[in-house]
Amino acid sequence: MARQITLFDFTLKKEQNKDESRKEEIPHANINEERRKPKEWIKEAEEGKSYFLLQVDYDGKKSKAICKLYDKETKKIYILYDNTGHKPYFLTDIDPEKVNKIPKVVRDPSFDHLETVIKIDPYSGNKIKLTKIVVKDPLAVRRMRNSVPKAYEAHIKYFNNYIYDLGLIPGLPYVVKKGKLEQLRPELKGEEVDEIRKAFADSDEMTKEAVNDWIPIFESEVPDVKRVAIDIEVYTPIKGRIPDPEKAEFPIISISLAGNDGTKRVLVLLREDVNSQITKHDVIVETFKSERELIRRFFDIILDYPIILTFNGDDFDIPYIYYRALKLNFTPEEIPFDIINDEGKYLAGIHIDLYKFFFNRAIRNYAFEGKYNEYNLDAVATALLGMSKVKLDTLISFLDLDKLIEYNSRDAEITLKLTTFNNNLVWKLIILLARISKMGLEELTRTEVSTWIKNLYYWEHRRRNWLIPLKEEILTRSSQIKTAAIIKGKRYKGAVVIDPPAGVFFNVVVLDFASLYPSIIRNWNISYETVDVENCKNKEYVRDETGEVLHYICKDKPGITAVITGLLRDFRVKVYKKKAKSQNISEEQRSVYDVVQRAMKVFINATYGVFGAENFPLYAPAVAESVTAIGRYVITTTVNYCRSIGLQVLYGDTDSMFLWNPSKEKLEEIIKFVKGKFGLDLEVDKVYKFVAFSGLKKNYLGVYPDGKTDIKGMLAKKRNTPEFIKKEFNEVKQLVTTINSPDDIPKIRDQLEYKIKEIYEKLRHKGYNLDELAFRVMLSKPLESYTKNTPQHVKAALQLRSYGVMVLPRDIIMFVKVKSKDGVKPVQLAKLSEIDVDKYIDAVRSTFEQILKAFGLIGANLLQLLSILSLT
């Protein structure tokens, strides 16, 4: 404890004494004090110069939209204020005369004026007249929208509204002409354009027109923007406690920076209570006797960078720096950061919190194919980079400076490399996603894929001058759901699943419908304004797997969802997947095209899930139900055809079928059948040496010819499974991969039985340590929010808090199961002697019985194996 007091006294108290005279001259820093104007941090863009648009914000002091532009020559951010006179607004369907009689609108201090505008009804294609209520302040829209019967386009952030109206696309290059942004189109060779147009030769006219607008999105240069990753280390007096950023009561002891310009730098505080000897490092080390001077130096360095990268910087690094600087008597005008809506804003450029980007499920599942299961820096970096954080055996507070520098610099290095590895894959992906979604970098990297898709479709509505319909109007105009859900919590029947047998099957081929739901949306012209609409001449009926008619789709005109989804799918499949594999271009260009197709994959695969979600603003129940019904019809029809030609379908789930020992000729026949009947692409996705089915849906272990495994649904794959189970399961998995024929099964069965006994004995004799026994579960919300029930990890977190440990949302809680009232204890408070062995035996049984059931059908005495785990 003496060490803790010494350090605290040495930093904060000395800083306070040193700055007493400064306090007399400079008023105490107030968070609400007027901040330095943005243009003092960033220079304005010049007429005639070209830039990349990265972000659009709103400057409340000037009451104008502000574009943040990157100059790849100077490597700096510049700003361009709106000079079109654009103002915030929303629409209503009542006449201006009636609006003028609503005092809460026209007497509001922010009311500006009314206009009459013409929009197109997405359903009928007819022109409709609306009143545009123009205001001076975006917040006024929120106040006024409830004062009119129907307020259209009144829940859109102002900077997004600005992007829609001006047709801007963040991530693309522009030139400043007469104070406005004019898009620069890439120069393509004639054969490249011909190749793209050929891919869309059979498309409708709306799609063909859209193709020309989308080419720059995929073909324009992706700038390698100058950026720096930062990471701070803060003194912590108690093990496990995360310092509160808003209180910022403990000193910052080091800040590391790693830039894509080669910068590697650590700013470190010299302290009397730790070994301050510094040996040679591969980073530049700057030492400071004063924490205030360390922070001031940090501010000076980062102003040279237009982009700052952090990992969880919104929640910790940026707010801690900001509030700590205020506490050390920096004025707000001296601090190039601000905290707005719980986001850490970098006033001299753009701040990207990579934690939130990698936390996005669409990025994890579609862009990186589930390579990481946890979202902390160490887990993501290990999975994607093969690098990990420096391991520590003591508190950061007590590290000697040498170890602190190594630890701190590694974190910044890893954070930067997450955007630079594999030819800047992640950075390019962010830019491409910004272009597709029409979102600025800061909002894109902090929001879910549903927001990206919503933004894309709103932008497309505005480009066509379509009125963006109200959610309640879509629900009213959409017909009712006709099917009952099988899964609890769903409103309509979902995908068809063919129950798998329990057993081991050799030579299994998996056929996959390429992007099934997006392809159905495109091929059947499904969109909220095409399903069950009135006054339709050309109808196509939607039938489910039983032949029952559920809905009809209007083919009079292309639906917007069908056009955009089909366009992205065809760009990916027909153009960029091929380019990413082409040997006629450079490796660098291939990597760019690979990023392009990955970005489209994210949108394509997420489309149905988003449009089928009830909270999505363009959700129509009949649309979601039509897609799944057609999917069931396609799968059922295909399975029946397979069986009619002698193919045995072992298992089927949503968009795939597992076929047992099919011939090449039969595979070609079924692929041809699907293409001819449905216009869908059926592909060979996987070929297994064998598959072990447990008999449960979405639950199997497949082994490829090269010995690699593919595990689905088994508990040992779950990220909260204790390490000892994962380790033992991996050993079992290695045993199973040695199987080459049914003749190998008896030997493996004996080895499995021995392994089960070994695990049991090790548990009974406390052969595993606490870390190996720990369950790891992320805390998804503040502890106070758990009011209805208290999950086990929350019980453990509450115990930690009772010992003074700060526990925050997104913390990973490590706990073990013990014999006590709560039944659990956090690892930090538990003893090995307290472990409830029976609970762990249950966990082992539930994990291993899934794989043992597969072998039970070919001779293994399953009941005997499982009964071993019931012995007491």
Swiss-Prot record:
SUPFAM superfamilies, sorted: DNA/RNA polymerases, Ribonuclease H-like
GO biological process: DNA-templated DNA replication
E.C. number(s) listed in UniProt: 2.7.7.7
Record GO terms (molecular function): DNA binding; DNA-directed DNA polymerase activity; nucleotide binding
Hydrolase found in the keyword field: no
Pfam families on file: DNA_pol_B, DNA_pol_B_exo1
Keyword Oxidoreductase: no
Keywords for the protein's UniProt record, in alphabetical order: DNA replication, DNA-binding, DNA-directed DNA polymerase, Nucleotidyltransferase, Transferase
InterPro entries associated with the record: DNA-dir_DNA_pol_B, DNA-dir_DNA_pol_B_CS, DNA-dir_DNA_pol_B_exonuc, DNA-dir_DNA_pol_B_multi_dom, DNA/RNA_pol_sf, DNA_pol_palm_dom_sf, DNA_pol_type-B, RNaseH-like_sf
Reactions mediated catalytically: DNA(n) + a 2'-deoxyribonucleoside 5'-triphosphate = DNA(n+1) + diphosphate
Family: Belongs to the DNA polymerase type-B family.
Name recorded for this polypeptide: DNA polymerase 1
